[in-house]
Structures are given as structure tokens and as C-alpha cells.
Amino acid sequence: MASHLADVQAKPIPTNTKLFSMLALLNAYVPDSYLIMEECQQILGPPDPIYGGPPFEDRMKPFSDLLRVSGSRVDLVHPDIAMKRLADLNIRRSSVARSCIFLLCGEQAQPNTVRFVKDLLTKREMGQKGKEKFSHLIKDIIKEETFGQALRVLKNASNKFKDKHIFPQTVARLYYVGGSKPNFKKAEIWAKEAIERAQNNSYAADTLGQVYKNHLLKKVKLPYEIKGIAEKAFEAFRDVENKAQRELGRELSEWVGSGNFSDGFNNRGHFGFIQVAKIISGKYRRLHPFKQTLKSEVEDKFEFFEWYLSYSKLDKITVEPDYFWKDVATCYKAYTGEDAADSTSFPALVDCLNHGLFVSKERRAKFSVTEKTQSDLEQIRDELKTDYENNVDDVQVAERYVLSNIILSNKVPDSPQQPLVIELQQILQRFLSTGVHESDPEFYLLVLLLFWPEENPRTGEENDNEELNTPETEEDQLRDQPSEEVSINKDDPGENPEQPPLGLISDPDLEHCVTLMEKTYDNVYGKYLRGRYLLPLFFLGKGRGLSRWIHRSRLDAVVQRHVETESDNDPSEPNPNKTKRKKINHMWKSGDVWELPEIQNMLQPIQIETTQQREEAKVTVDCVGGKNITSRIDDKPIKSPVRFYLGFNIRGPVVFYVGAPLNASE
């Protein structure tokens, strides 16, 4: 073997060495990659074994022992030693990469092989600050060889695959962030080439915006230059946003013949706009020519990210990079003068109890935002009540007032609530009767929380609101009469318009509300949140009235205390924050969170039914009073479930399957 390696350095590379080097490079950088035997024989050249040539294993000596042949597939026995073998061969990675491009990706190339080569050159892994700038191979070529060699490989690939936008995109990125001296002019040319190849693709369009953004950030200083590049950047990111709006989820590909499809909504147009607005606000210290013209758009983007981050995250344990919310909130304050933490929009109220938690987006952004106190929440509630009383026909104002009471109840769970529950039910019933709520999933979330069946504490039966219909005053007696005998003067200031006659409206059909909530979710948020994990916002607890609804933050606080207690026993930990986040994520992913006694004492187990007729992702929740309500399910546990908990996300009710605890090996 050693003598053969010495020969490699002095002579042209033999075909078997060339083939082995390509297998080694692919296996080292692209897990589970392989080549088809037919491809291998083409690289080795004649004579083929079927025409009397020597067996494949003989032709591949001295590498045969390192190869594995399984059917028609060929790969390495030990991919982990592939890089060492490449180093032993003393063949540059860039040279092998070009061989992969030209020898494996001809006109009759195998589709999987083309995919492996594409991943080799362009697939970026997720790092702590978001996606890496380049694939692992390209980073290694820049580090171990030169920037020029990496550029040459990517240009070769771009010229070879003229129908794929990803390669000119990557060349553009290399020009503006890969070298010691960015070349924004060439980056712009290659970014426009990417757009030309995929004119309706939002991800291809994003690269041009990134070129302008980085140009602003790193090089532009003079006011006229700032203005010119900023205008180009805003135009580019608006183009990204428009194209993202027209892209469809992949699940629709079989129904729609043609179009652009993506696994998730591309938020880079929104976020790129925010970043550019933030950059120029820092460059214009005094006279900011864009401030007033951009304010409305910045507010719109801020509202988008408020609900986007309050209702969802990338997956069950992955959130946006720490800088994400920092850039959004900082830009919002620069253009409006308002703190993001003071917002009282519906998603901001949903999220406000997270303030101060280790896992909150505010803490990750390193903002000094503290936990909301009871006094803070009471003040918010009172302000929203006044706002509602002055705008009784505004359903969104009503929603915020109702929600503020549920949020406050999580701080003061033992306060008297029955009269308050009745008041809030009346508000929702009034809008149910008018139909003005029909485009709003938040409204149905509140209806489900306020009217979810519960037992009457005196009888143990379902609380059917009998006490609401027991007349105690002259006004109550009037309300209990049939509708044709009741006269309401809307112009009479003595009447209270937000409290309609309860006897005229029956409790809502919750099963129908679940259906309507899913429908409105699909209409309002479905496009934007597809492919993301919908966060549970509330869980059904053991209390009564508003106290039944446990905000997700209370579970996170318990998990945080548990992890911090464990960490106190290991003061030698070099990166405590990273370790803490990892442990918190593991508890949610593994299901250990459900085994904590504090959480078990909070949550109310439920009974469910499954039937063959129902969709696989749905079950029926058995409620008191014999009512059955359809719910989706979260991930099932590895082991058989032993109990079930009910949560709510912005799409509707969700059942959490709690399995038996896993042992260490599992």
C-alpha cells in the first residue's frame, strides 16, 4: 500500500485510484452516498468483466478491502476513515470534486449521483447562528487549499448544471463572504444569473438581496451610496417576498400541475427587509431619508414576526438563531420608538408570560426583559378593557381583552372567577351571533377555552351554565324571556352592548368551532407556518374556570428549574448556557417533561377514542357530559401511551401522548 501511494505522486492518477478518491470524497462529506456499479465500470474503462475483463475487486486493488459492494451499489466499508485515505493519496479535494462533476454527471447520469454531487458542493449544515455559509467541502477547500480553487470548483459546477440556480447562488455568496476581499460587483452578476435560471423561485431571488445587504454593511459609507444600495436591497427583498407568497406547499404538487413548491414559507424577504432597514438606521445618525416612508412597512414586518415566532418554531426543539428577534425588535424601535416587549397584540399577549424565561426569544436576544408581574398584567387588562368598552364592535379588541384575563389568571390562579367567566362568555357569544369573527382562528381559540366542558363543582356533572339563566334581577328576568319579547335600544347609553341576553344564544357547538378554527388557520396562517412546529399555547389543567388553562410558560419554568438544579451539581461545565438549552430541549423531545411531579400536578389527564374512520393524525377527546371533540395529536411516544394531556395551538386542540419513561439505553 505504501509503495503504491509513492507511485501515485509520481505518475498520472490510475483509474482505480481516481474512482476510489471519488468514493472517498462522497462518503466523507455526503452520508449514505454511493455509486452504481455501472458508473464505476465506466470510470475504470474497458475491459468490462462481462466481456471477459478481470473482476471489479481485482481491478480495485489495493483498495478492495476498503470497498463494499451491495447489489449494484458501491461505497466504503468505513466512511469515517475516508478522509484519512484521501490525505494518504495526497490528492487535492478540489481535484476530486471536479472529477465528480465531469466524470459522474454526464448526460446519462444517475439522478441519485447528481443529488450526491449537488449536496457535496452546496448543502449547508445548521450551525449555532443559522445555516453555515457553505458546504463542509467548500469550507475545507478554502481552508486547506485556496479561495480560488473553491471558486473554480463551483464555477465548473455552475457551467455543468446550467439548469440549477443553486450553483450561481453559491458562487455569488463566495464572492461576497467567502474571500478576504469581497467582490460585490461579481457577486451581483452571479446572483442575477441565479434569478435568470429560476425566475419564480424566492430562494434564488434572496441571494441578490443578500449581496446588497452585505454591501451596505461592509463597504458603503457615503450618504448617496447608502441611499442607492439600500433602494436596490429593498427592491430585491420585496421581490423575494412576492415570490414567496406565490409558492405552494409540496403537498399540493400532485394537484397543481406546475408551479414553484417549497417545504416551508421563505421568510427571508421579510427578514432581509428588516435587516436592511436596521442597517441604514444605524448609518443615518441624523437625517434619515427613509424613516417615515419605511415606518409602516417595518410595523407590518414586525407584526408578521410577532405571530410567526409566538405561534411556531422551526421544529420541536429548534428555534430561529438568537440574533433573529434582536434584529426585528431593534429595527422596530428604531422606526417607531416603541419597545417590542410593551406590545399588547394578541400574539404578544400569548408570549408575554415567557419574558424572563431562559428559553424566551428575549433572553436569547440578550434583551434585559423581565418577567411580567401581576401588577403589569392587571394594568394591561384594565387598559384593554377600556379599549374594548370604547370599541365594542371590534372583534380583535375584544379578543385581546378576553385573552388578557386568561393570561392574568395564570399569575393569580386562585382568584374568584365565575362572574368574570360569564362576562367573557357573553362577549364571545355576542360576536358568535353576528358572524364578524369568521376569518380569525384566535377567536375560536378563545371560544374553545371559555366554553370547554367542565364539571359542576356541586354535582360533579357538566357545568351547563344553569346559574346564568337563573333570574335574580328585573334585568335578568327580561333576558330570560323569548327573543321576540325583548327590545334592545342600541342607542340608549344605559344599555350595555357588550353583554347581550344570554338566554337568546345557546352554547356554541365546539366540534363545529374546531372545524372552523382549522379552516381559518389554513386561510390566515397555513401558508406561512407550513412545515413548522406549532407551539402549544395552553394546556388543560386541574383548576376551574380560567384557572383550568395552563400557559406553556408555566411548564417551561418547571423544566428550567429542574435543569438548573441538576446543573448546580456540575459547576465544572465549560458552557453552562449551551448545556442548559440542550438539556431543556432533550426533556421536551424525550418526553421527560411529562414525568416531572410539578407538571403532573398541574395538568388534567384526559380520555380519548380512536376509530378506523378518523384521519391518522386525529383522535376524539371524551369530555364531561358525553361530548366528543376531535383533536389532532402531537408526536406519539416510543412506548405505549399511559396517559394523555390536552393542549391548544393556533390551529386547534392537540392531544399529547405520554408514554412510559424511557431508560438510559433508549
Region locations from a protein language model:
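Conserved GTPase G-domain substructure that encodes guanine base recognition and part of the catalytic core
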Residues: 1-5, 45-47, 228
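Short, surface-exposed secondary-structure edge patches
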Residues: 632-636
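Amphipathic alpha-helical segments of the small helical/lid subdomains adjacent to P-loop NTPase cores
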Residues: 1-19, 51-55
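C-terminal leucine-rich, beta-strand-based interaction scaffolds used for sensing/assembly
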Residues: 26-159, 166-169, 175
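Extended alpha-helical scaffold/coiled-coil
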Residues: 111-631, 641
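Short coil-to-beta transition motif at edge beta-strands of beta-rich domains
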Residues: 637-643
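OB-fold/S1-family single-stranded nucleic acid-binding modules
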Residues: 647-666
